[in-house]
Amino acid sequence: MIKVVGVRFRTAGKIYYFDPKDLELPLGSHVIVETARGVEYGTVMVPPKGVTDDEVVQPLKPVLRASTPEDDKTEQKNREKERQAYKTCQEKIQKHKLNMKLVEAEYTFDNNKLLFYFTADGRIDFRELVKDLASVFRTRIELRQIGVRDETKILGGVGICGRELCCHTFLSEFAPVSIKMAKEQNLSLN
C-alpha cells in the first residue's frame, strides 16, 4: 500500500496524485507540489489515503509543503498578473492581426513560465507574437491551442437544462460524444 493525496490545480481540473510524506493535509487545504511543469500551488481534493501499487503511476512526486500565508499571497498576485497578461496578449493578437481567440492566461507558481490558452479554426503562425510577448513579460512564453470543449470547461456557462455546465463544475475528463447522443438531445450536428 502507498499513501497518496489528490491535488487539483484549476477549477474542475483533473486530480493528480502525490506523495504526502508525513504531512497532515485535510480536504480543501492548499499545498505546494513538484510537478513536471515545476513547483505548483494546488488544493487537496482527496485527503491522504492508502492505495495499491498498481493504481498509481510511479514514481510519485512529493508534496513539498502545506502552503504558507506567503504562498497564498504569491498565488493571489499571480492571479492578478494573469489578468493583466490576458489584456496585454489580447492587444498583441489584434496588433499582429491573428485569427485566434484568447481563452486564458496562466502563470506557473514560481513565475518561470506564462501559458496562454487559445482557440482557432486552423493552424496559426504565432512565432512573432511569442517574441513580442517574451520581450514584454521577460519570462518563458507558451501558447497552447485548445478545443471548444476545453474552452467551455475553462470559461463555464449555463446548459440547456438551466444549470451550470457539467464540464465546468465536476467533469474532469471528456468522453467522446456520438451522433446518436447529439440527436437524442436535439443538439445541432455541426
Regions found by a protein language model. Give the residues of each.
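Acidic-enriched and Gly/Ser
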Residues: M1-L189
